[in-house]
A protein has these predicted regions:
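Active-site gating loops and adjacent loop-to-helix segments of metal-dependent hydrolytic enzymes
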Residues: 1-4, 60
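The substrate-binding groove and active-site-proximal loops of carbohydrate-active enzymes
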Residues: 3-16, 74
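Active-site loop segments of alpha/beta catalytic cores
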Residues: 15-171
Length: 171
């Protein structure tokens, strides 16, 4: 994988020109009635989709890359974090009032791999977004991440979602 050859998101108005119109229209439609959420996939989740080429229930190729070529995986995750932050910033500037970061494939990771390959890159993306829009609430959701909920509490997100595995009376 040639990470340096990947195209950065320099100008979202050019790469996703429809987004400003759609989010702007939705914002006008929902104004005073509902909060408009923007959303992004997290770097690990997007990397898994990219490496696997589709949704995959095991993510074997992604895990193989994580452990056999960690330098490439880290460079790829860093690239995604920076670019997905730019995309999220664009959504906010187009009218999104809250942003949710979905770590849809967290359940494929053990706690240690979550700490190495998912958390730092999701947190980097969130920090980059917060630099530009510190007052925009950001929600982080790690599907299956309840097993390592404690590891998420120091993230830059304003809110951490819990999944169905959490016993709410223990919270």
């Amino acid at each position: 994988m040639q990470v340096k050859a990947l195209t950065p998101v320099d100008d979202p108005d050019k790469s996703v020109p429809f987004l400003r119109e759609i989010i702007g229209s939705l914002r006008k439609e929902t104004e005073g009635k509902a909060t408009l959420l923007g959303f992004i996939g997290s770097p690990f989740t997007l990397a898994a989709y990219s490496v696997e080429g589709k949704a995959n229930k095991n993510c074997f190729n992604t895990k193989k890359m994580m452990h056999n070529d960690p330098a490439i995986m880290h460079a790829f995750l860093d690239h995604i974090a920076e670019n997905i932050a730019a995309y999220a910033i664009h959504q906010i500037e187009c009218g999104a009032q809250v942003l949710q970061v979905f770590e849809s494939w967290a359940h494929h990771l053990g706690p240690d791999d979550f700490d190495v390959f998912a958390k730092p890159y999701a947190d980097k993306a969130i920090a980059l977004i917060k630099e530009k829009h510190p007052d925009t609430p950001i929600i982080y959701f790690a599907n299956g991440g309840s097993a390592y909920l404690e590891r998420q509490k120091d993230m830059n997100a304003d809110m951490i979602c819990v999944d169905w595995q959490v016993l709410m009376h223990l919270m």
